[in-house]
Amino acid sequence: MAIERTFSIIKPDAVAKNHIGAIYNRFETAGLKIVAAKMLHLTKEQAEGFYAEHSERGFFGALVAFMTSGPIMVQVLEGENAVLAHREILGATNPAQAAPGTIRADFAESIDENAAHGSDAVESAAREIAYFFSAEELCPRTR
């Protein structure tokens, strides 16, 4: 098993409903360690930059508007096969299709406001982590 880092966002809908602590509990119960975290209110430019790969898709404007609608929590999680483990905890992108007990099944209302984001691969995790965190902000958990 490989120790990896992955990037995670708790989106404005879940922050507004005070689900941060419950979601962090899910991460930690699954064996993922939080090695960096901060609350941000994204600017339009930050959201457009982060989601640039979707800029030509029809939902881009709505996505940017949603992600700038309120504060978010961004965090870096570390653990064995962290990318896959985190995505399993999140559940399907569409909460209507997410397995019971997953974050999206329990905390999301719709595919558009689906509570959380998780990197889909080690490579995208590295890119997404670097977008929000400097190397100095990452705190390895050795105990």
From Swiss-Prot:
The keyword Cytoplasm applies. This is Nucleoside diphosphate kinase. Belongs to the NDK family. GO terms for cellular component: cytoplasm. Keywords: ATP-binding, Cytoplasm, Kinase, Magnesium, Metal-binding, Nucleotide metabolism, Nucleotide-binding, Phosphoprotein, Transferase. Its EC number is 2.7.4.6. Its cofactor is Mg(2+). It holds the Pfam family NDK. The active site is at H117 (pros-phosphohistidine intermediate). It comes from Shewanella sp. (strain W3-18-1). Major role in the synthesis of nucleoside triphosphates other than ATP. The ATP gamma phosphate is transferred to the NDP beta phosphate via a ping-pong mechanism, using a phosphorylated active-site intermediate. Homotetramer. It is found in: Cytoplasm.
